[in-house]
C-alpha cells in the first residue's frame, strides 16, 4: 500500500513539473524540483542549476526558437529503487500553441525524498 502511495506521489511530482512549466509558474517548478538540479542532455553535456530562476531562464531560451507552448506526457512509469528514490521513465510531446507537434521525447527522471519533500533531483533527457 505504501509503495502505491509513493508511486502516486512521484507521478504527482511529474505532473506538477509539467503543469508548472505549461502555466509559466515558477513557484510550482520550485516545488517540483530539488536544487541544485542536474540535467544530462542527449549530447552528454551536464547542466546544473542552483535555483528555479536559473533553470527557467535556460528553459525559456531553449524553447523560444521552436515556438514551444506546452508539453504533455504520453507515459509515466515510476520504478522504486529505495525508500527515498524512484527512477521514472517518461515519454512526452512538446507542442506549439496551435497544438502542432514540435517533437516526441524520452527522459529518465530521478525523484527523491529529501528536505522534507518528494521532488525531481535530476533528469537524463533526449530533448
Regions found by a protein language model. Give the residues of each.
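Short, low-complexity N-terminal intrinsically disordered segments enriched in polar/charged residues
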Residues: 1-31, 35, 41, 53
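A solvent-exposed, acidic/Ser-Thr-rich amphipathic alpha-helical stretch
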Residues: 27-76
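Short beta-strand segments enriched in hydrophobic/aromatic residues
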Residues: 33-34, 92-94, 124-125
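Short Pro/Gly-enriched beta-strand edge/turn motifs at strand-loop
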Residues: 57-60, 89-93
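A short hydrophobic beta-strand element
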Residues: 70, 82-92
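Hydrophobic/aromatic beta-strand elements that line small-molecule binding cavities or substrate pockets
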Residues: 73-79, 92-94, 106-112
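Short beta-strand edge/turn micro-motifs at domain boundaries
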Residues: 104-127
Amino acid at each position: 500500500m505504501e509503495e502505491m502511495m509513493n508511486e502516486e506521489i512521484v507521478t504527482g511530482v511529474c505532473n506538477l513539473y509539467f503543469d508548472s512549466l505549461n502555466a509559466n509558474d515558477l513557484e510550482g517548478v520550485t516545488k517540483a524540483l530539488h536544487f541544485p538540479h542536474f540535467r544530462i542532455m542527449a549530447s552528454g553535456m551536464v547542466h546544473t542549476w542552483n535555483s528555479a530562476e536559473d533553470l527557467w531562464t535556460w528553459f525559456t531560451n531553449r524553447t523560444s526558437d521552436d515556438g514551444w507552448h506546452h508539453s504533455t506526457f504520453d507515459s509515466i512509469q515510476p520504478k522504486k529503487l529505495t525508500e527515498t528514490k524512484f527512477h521514472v521513465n517518461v515519454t512526452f510531446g512538446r507542442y506549439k500553441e496551435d497544438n502542432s507537434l514540435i517533437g516526441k521525447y524520452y527522459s529518465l527522471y530521478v525523484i527523491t525524498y529529501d528536505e522534507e519533500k518528494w521532488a525531481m533531483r535530476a533528469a537524463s533527457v533526449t530533448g
